[in-house]
Swiss-Prot record:
This is Alanine--tRNA ligase. It comes from the Bacteria. It is found in: Cytoplasm. Gene3D superfamilies: 2.40.30.130, 3.10.310.40, 3.30.54.20, Bira Bifunctional Protein, Domain 2, Threonyl-trna Synthetase, Chain A, domain 2. Its EC number is 6.1.1.7. Belongs to the class-II aminoacyl-tRNA synthetase family. GO terms for molecular function: alanine-tRNA ligase activity; aminoacyl-tRNA deacylase activity; ATP binding; catalytic activity, acting on a protein; transferase activity; tRNA binding; zinc ion binding. It catalyses: tRNA(Ala) + L-alanine + ATP = L-alanyl-tRNA(Ala) + AMP + diphosphate.
Length: 877
């Protein structure tokens, strides 16, 4: 068996399949691109959906990758088991309609057992197969030579997630020996594929050969695929003879760095401490990679997952005696471990550390608030009949303040109290259900479109061309290939086209199609990419079109010009944001429409008005500098050396286009652009807002739309000038300031009048003193506007000491307010204003509360206000 470090093992896997004709694909971002069904990329195959469902045909149908992935469905098990992790790497080889079982199985065996590769002991390898998959069984036994005693048939070996591609699979297990088991040798689960620690699953090969239809039936797919997944960390634990994944070179440096910050704690000395070390090591890996790919802590979605991981790790740091923020110090350690294959963490270590430190500091304040709440919950439980902290309260401690359930239980037991575990579990399950619904179907896979996949005809988009003659090579009507289109709708493919197909945020060109006589035959309303990268023209048919004939394609020139303006302006905006806010700012999405753009980007903090103006100024300065826009076609590596900015979720083919505007902006981009920045004319930001945790959005207009926007604002300014009667535009501000001062003076005078009126009304109210028991009481509905007036009367009542109790109401058409104020005599009798008002507020459709000496409530049923006052008075005796 080879002794390899993590970098050597990862590279060996990729090299093996590269030698077998596979294209090595770089790991995709953890943040899914164009896939709303996924919260995170959670497997290697998650990045292959577009190939397996046929929406895109890869340049090479053989692909291999090492894909970083995140799964958080079993977060509570991380640290407690040998294998659970949130971040992991999935090694995989994939065939998109190329090879199948006859190649996939022997290759897996060769990589695992050949002396040239991993050289694992063949006697320690077992496989499981689906009972009906006799072909896989035969290959394992007859071709590979695996004895029958090492082949286990399991009904579970069928990969099926509902509608879409599915098929049998074969799992490979490594026997770690009974000495590493967690069940007795005679346990019924002690077999490959059972619940035990002896047989470690290291590789799964899925033979995707069927399509699961909506009616529950299965049909063979037109193209059979191979999808495999090997857990890098699991196999590494074998190669490094590590008891668990956490003793490999991927985790130990993080654990050792944590030891140095702890209060003398050592990994391996104490089981409880070991759990904390493992949780910290695992979580900081996931946190670092996720932030590096553009995610930021927040209250929803990915942001919530990050926040939860960070808090769990921080709490475990406290268990190890680490005070204050410390996780941010581990980010460079993670970067050093992974930089050979994933340089993004090391390259962004400063920014990632800053984000983590900020979040740790925030949690420090939250933690203290949580401890205060825990004390309140204990007091509440001590005064309850069942001496129990409710499950809902315990879950709030967990969910809002990051307190593990066990910590709440421990604190309760110290006081002789219990915690409602059933209630807690119910709240937890409800949250998981909400999360499941939010995630959607994490493994959803579309069905293959056989019609589009069969089309092999070339279809070339030609940059810089506005009209040209082209041959119609394919016609699709109602998902079928036909020779003639004479209905209302059709999809057309031409051998070459001036129409840009929607991609990279830029919407498609529109335009017209003419026959050789100059007759309009179709209007192009959309253009999209087919699986084999042809351009699909979606058209409204005007006159019949015939396959094989030549037509003139003519795009809407004005629309294209507007798109060029917006797309080039988007690049300038991206560069300006990075210049003003910092190079950690990443694009998080964009929409490019004619003379309008929407740009989403990552930012920890809100943008100040000054920063936003600076960004806008920089973009316009670059427009006025009349910079030549240079486009170069090259390979990705050369493009990167040129300084081209690669999007964190970008996947690039062998040939890429680099769009350059001097040294200010250099990006990979396949869109259409101006020849010179001066063609943009003018750039105007019309809105900026937060759209999610750490993600903000700018909307802007260019050229004609920018002029129209500014002209509209100028018209509004002229109207305001007329309304405030300013002699010129420059005088509007001073005129408004003068009007505001007049308004403040009038409001002040009005308030004085109202105070006099209320004082007069208060005098009449104070004359209505009556006795209830041994208390003097004023209880009435006052003829005032609302709560502010009631509070003024209460202040006057308090200063004059008119009675022991004041109960006032005020009502309007659809609202009611109530105020109760108690003097010292009433308080000495044990009365509490807050309790009184809570007991009667529902009578007038409201709710409220307050202090023992004063409370207030609001409601929506004014008709019930007098009854509520009477009910409050009745409780005084």
């Amino acid at each position: 068996m080879k002794k390899l470090n993590s970098s050597e093992f990862r590279q060996m896997f990729l090299d093996f399949f590269a030698e077998h004709g596979h294209m090595v694909m770089q790991s995709a971002s953890l943040i899914p691109k164009d896939d709303p069904t996924l919260l995170w990329i959670n497997s290697g195959v998650a990045t292959m959906k577009k190939y397996f469902d046929g929406s895109v045909v890869p340049k090479n149908r053989r692909i291999t990758s090492s894909q970083k992935s995140i799964r958080t469905n079993d977060i509570e098990n991380v640290g407690k088991t040998a294998r659970h992790q949130t971040l992991f790497e999935m090694l995989g080889n994939f065939s998109v309609g190329d090879y199948f079982k006859e190649e996939a199985i022997p290759w897996a065996w060769e990589f695992l057992t050949s002396p040239d590769w991993l050289d694992l002991d063949k006697d320690k390898l077992y496989v499981t197969v689906y009972p009906k998959d006799t072909e896989a069984h035969r290959i394992w036994h007859e071709v590979v030579g695996l004895p029958e005693s090492h082949i286990v048939q399991l009904e579970d070996n069928f990969w099926d997630i509902g509608e879409g591609p599915c098929g049998p699979d074969s799992e490979i297990f490594y026997d770690r020996g009974q000495e590493n088991n967690d069940v007795p040798e005679d346990d019924p689960e002690n077999y490959p594929g059972g619940e035990n620690a002896r047989y470690l699953e290291i590789w799964n090969i899925v033979f995707s050969e069927f399509n699961h239809l909506p009616d529950g039936s299965y049909v063979e797919q037109p193209h059979k695929n191979i999808d495999t997944g090997m857990g890098l960390e699991r196999v590494l634990s074998i190669l490094q003879d590590a008891p668990t994944n956490f003793e490999t070179d991927l985790f130990l440096p993080i654990i050792h760095a944590t030891e140095e910050m702890s209060a003398g704690k050592k990994y391996g000395a104490n089981k409880a401490d070991d759990i904390s070390f493992k949780i910290i090591a695992d979580h900081i890996r996931a946190i670092s990679f996720a932030i590096g790919d553009g995610a930021l802590p927040g209250n929803t979605g990915r942001g919530y997952v990050l926040r939860r991981l960070l808090r769990r790790a921080a709490l475990n740091g406290r268990k190890l005696g680490i005070d204050g923020a410390f996780l941010y110090k581990l980010v460079p350690v993670v970067g050093d471990i992974m930089k050979s294959h994933y340089p993004e963490v090391s390259d962004q270590a400063e920014f990632i550390s800053k984000v983590v430190k900020n979040e740790e500091d925030r949690f420090g304040a939250t933690l203290e608030a949580g401890l205060t709440l825990l004390d309140d919950l204990i007091d509440k439980a001590e005064n309850s009949e069942d001496k129990t902290i409710s499950g809902k309260d315990a879950f709030k401690m967990f969910d809002t303040y990051g307190f593990p359930y066990e910590l709440t239980v421990e604190a309760a037991e110290d006081k002789g109290l219990k915690v409602d575990k059933d209630g807690f579990d119910a709240e937890m399950e409800a949250q998981k259900e909400r999360a499941r619904k939010a995630r959607g179907n994490l493994q959803s896979m579309g069905s293959q479109d056989e019609t589009l996949m069969k089309i092999k005809d070339k279809s070339v988009f030609e940059y810089g061309v506005y009209e040209e003659e082209s041959q119609l090579v394919d016609i699709i009507v109602d998902d079928k290939l036909v020779d003639k289109a004479d209905g209302e709708k059709a999809t057309l493919i031409f051998d070459k086209t001036p129409f840009y197909a929607e991609r990279g945020g830029q919407v498609a060109d529109h335009g017209d199609i003419y026959d050789q006589e100059g007759n309009l035959v179709a209007r192009v309303v959309d253009v999209q990419h087919a699986p084999n990268d042809q351009n699909l023209h979606f058209v409204d048919v005007v006159l019949p079109l015939v396959k094989g004939q030549t037509y003139k394609l003519k795009i809407d020139r004005a629309r294209r010009e507007g798109l060029r303006h917006s797309h080039s302006a988007t690049h300038l905006l991206h560069a300006a944001l990075r210049q003003v806010l910092g190079e950690h700012t990443h694009q998080a999405g964009s929409v490019v429409e004619p003379d309008y753009l929407r740009f989403d980007f990552t930012s920890l903090d809100p943008i100040t008005p000054r920063e936003l103006k600076n960004v806008e100024k920089i973009v316009n300065e670059k427009i006025w500098e009349a910079i030549q826009v240079k486009t170069t076609e090259t390979d990705p590596e050369t493009g990167k050396k040129m300084g081209a900015l690669a999007l964190f979720d970008g996947k690039y083919t062998d040939k890429v286009r680099v769009v350059q505007m001097d040294d200010f902006s250099i990006e990979f981009c396949g869109g259409t652009h101006c020849d010179n920045t001066s063609q943009i004319g003018v750039f105007k930001i019309i809105s900026e807002q937060a759209i999610g945790a750490g993600v903000r959005r700018i909307e802007a207009v260019t050229s004609k739309l920018a002029y129209e926007y500014l002209a509209g604002r100028s018209d509004i300014l002229d109207q305001i000038q007329a309304q405030v009667k300013a002699t010129k535009v420059d005088g509007i501000q001073s005129k408004i300031a003068s009007l505001q001062e007049e308004l403040r003076s009038a409001e002040k005078q009005n308030a004085a009048y109202e105070a006099q009126i209320n004082a007069s009304k208060a005098g009449k109210i104070f004359d209505q003193v009556k006795t209830v028991g041994d208390l003097t009481v004023i209880a009435t509905i006052a003829d005032v506007k609302g709560m502010n007036d009631l509070r003024e009367i209460a202040d006057q009542w308090k200063s004059e000491g008119k009675s022991d109790v004041l109960i006032l109401g005020a009502k309007s058409e659809d609202k009611a307010n109530m105020l109760i104020s108690l003097g010292q005599k009433a308080l000495d009798k044990g009365l509490k204003a807050g309790d009184l008002i809570k007991s009667v507020a529902a009578i007038f459709g409201g709710g409220g509360g307050g202090r023992p000496n004063m409370a207030q409530a609001g409601g929506k049923n004014p008709e019930g206000l007098q009854d509520a006052i009477d009910a409050a008075v009745s409780q005084l005796d």
